[in-house]
Design a protein with these regions (language model features):
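Terminal domain-start segments
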Residues: 20-88
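Bacterial Sec-dependent N-terminal signal peptides
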Residues: 1-25
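Short beta-strand elements that form the blades of beta-propeller/WD-repeat-like
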Residues: 93-101, 169-176
Length: 217
């Protein structure tokens, strides 16, 4: 009996405790989500700040904030990767990973996980869907008699990235219209824009859309 208990305790303490902090989440994130670096390379990156990734390039640690549970990595010359942890009301953890590539317009995605990498926040009531129309003033478009179909046809491609925050719990959604449209077209549509950033406000368990505003890069 004592031997069985000892083996059980050994196994428990041998497993990585993902909920302890953001570093563990980053190191053990399955490679299907982050193939540039394996767990050993990620551990080395947190210690040495720069490593050679699986594609022969350099990946660089840009930020490591254990207190605020945030990590940011430049995976390549044009690629970026972030992870962030929130603590829910029931004391469980919620994690997010965000990535984007700029060439030159920036485009990326975001995924959420519970502990042990179970996908989370798939309900639109927890994380709202983002539309290009969120960034435009519909009344101004209607005043110029720009139809919904004309608008959708012009913006059938939508470049956005999700920036996690090193010192806060909100998320910034940033569109990159300026970099994928030619200058003449951008100047035509700019008067109808409300902004190039949409703040997603953290409400202790879900996000809701907040203000849209401009900020130059």
């Amino acid at each position: 009996m004592k031997k069985t208990i000892s083996i059980f305790i050994f196994l428990i303490f041998s497993l990585p405790f993902f909920a302890q902090g953001i570093s563990d989440f980053f190191i053990y994130l399955p490679e299907s989500y982050f193939s540039q670096l394996n767990p050993d390379q990620r551990r080395k990156l947190l210690n040495d700040s720069t490593v050679t990734n699986n594609y022969g390039g350099k990946s660089t640690l840009l930020a490591l904030n254990e207190e605020n549970n945030y990590i940011k990595v430049q995976t390549s010359g044009q690629g970026f990767f972030e992870v962030k942890k929130w603590t829910l009301k029931d004391s469980t953890a919620l994690f997010a990973m965000s990535f984007w590539v700029c060439s030159p317009a920036c485009d990326g995605g975001i995924s959420f996980f519970k502990e042990n990498y179970t996908p989370a926040m798939r309900d639109k009531n927890q994380f709202p869907s983002i539309k290009i129309s969120d960034f435009f003033n519909r009344d101004s478009l209607a005043a110029k008699e720009i139809s919904e179909n004309d608008f959708k046809n012009r913006f059938d491609i939508f470049f956005i990235r999700f920036e996690l925050q090193p010192s806060g719990n909100d998320i910034l959604v940033i569109h990159d219209i300026q970099n994928y449209m030619n200058k003449e077209d951008y100047e035509k549509w700019k008067p109808f824009l409300k902004g190039n950033r949409l703040r997603l406000i953290w409400r202790d368990g879900y996000f809701e859309k907040g203000e849209v505003y401009f900020r130059e890069e």
